[in-house]
Amino acid sequence: MEGTGAPVKTKRRYDSSRRRKQALRTRDAILAAARELFLGGGYAATTIASIAEAADVSVETIYKGFGGKPGLVRAISEKGLEGAGPIPAEQRSDEMRTLKRDPYTVMQRWGAFTTEVAPLAAPIALLLRTAAATDREVASLLDELDRARLARMEHNARELFERGDFRDGITLEYARDVLWTYSSPELYEMLVLRQGWPVERYGQFVAEGMIAALLPERREQPGHNLL
């Protein structure tokens, strides 16, 4: 019969889209439940069964999707690094670094990104640091995530280095290490979690520190404020 193909294809596309959305909702529910339980009760004490119960899914669903607790923590960490916006923070950082030629503005924005990402990612990294003392698999995951952050900081520094934005004598490796230090979960822990700094003040401190460590002194225009 003529005219019967299109409606079937449309229905299949609709069903497929609905399944994908449901799968994403399920994944988000699992990660939210796992994050809350890990941070509330600790890594070792949290079981897959308790996460499944909190997320209203089966244990098998979690093992199939994440492979166990290390996979869950990796996924939670990756989600945290995306930030809170609809576009992942790393993508926004890349786009901003390309569009903004002023390195001072770039680093101010990076400081702002830390206020968005650190509250999501740092507590999980600190949780792993504690668990790594007695769990080899967690220690390996922590090392993997830390090396990935170091590589990301080198990626961030490279374009500014190649454009000649840094002070004379600043190497790519030095710039990478400065960014790595200022993005560390330990710095967030010291200033925000322990000392009670507002996260906005912490982000400003990060931006000012990176600028002072890497960029030449800026001649300010009358009425101009760096941050």
Enumerate the predicted regions with their spans.
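Amphipathic alpha-helical packing segments from all-alpha helical-bundle domains
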Residues: 112-129, 136-163, 173-177, 208-212
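Helix-turn-helix
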Residues: 29, 33, 37-71, 75
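Amphipathic, non-transmembrane alpha-helical scaffold segments
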Residues: 23, 31, 77, 107, ...
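Hydrophobic/aromatic-rich alpha-helical bundle segments in the mid-to-C-terminal region
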Residues: 139, 161-208, 217-227
